[in-house]
């Protein structure tokens, strides 16, 4: 009998980034030290310093990884939609309010929230990779073929849902979420 190949364990850089995310999620940016990230990643401090020579470099890498993840999820959400006016807005609606085609989990949102807060409190310039992704998204929304303000309203509502989760302000019930989604969906229907 042939054994199935074992999955390759994550490389040291990925383990360090995963550990840093978990630390900022559990203890905030103040809890993130190079020593703690190295320990939790199972590498020496020298091994960590080989990849990231400072806390700022580590946080910067976390934000770049998050920006890449956001861009990939956003593009996948668009690809899942049919061509034509409102495609970007439908994707944003599904991404922000949930749909079978979206793969972002609560755990991913929580980790993203922790990284956003860590960067915001440590050095707001670290958010520049995220700002670049958002600028591309906004350009796509402007060219989406909907009446002015419709795509922006859908995006702002999705951002509001993320902020409510980020700051633990409230969690809408599934019924409330469905009602909001239906109301926002009417903004997209104008394009059809």
What spans do the regions from the language model cover?
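N-terminal intrinsically disordered/low-complexity leader segments
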Residues: 1-11
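Helix-turn-helix
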Residues: 15, 19, 23-57, 61
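Solvent-exposed, amphipathic alpha-helical segments
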Residues: 19-26, 73-76, 157-164
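Short, basic, alpha-helical segments at the C-terminal edge of helix-turn-helix-like DNA-binding modules
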Residues: 64-69
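Hydrophobic alpha-helical connector segments
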Residues: 72-111
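Hydrophobic/aromatic-rich alpha-helical bundle segments in the mid-to-C-terminal region
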Residues: 103-107, 124-192
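Generic transmembrane alpha-helix motif of multi-pass integral membrane proteins
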Residues: 113-120
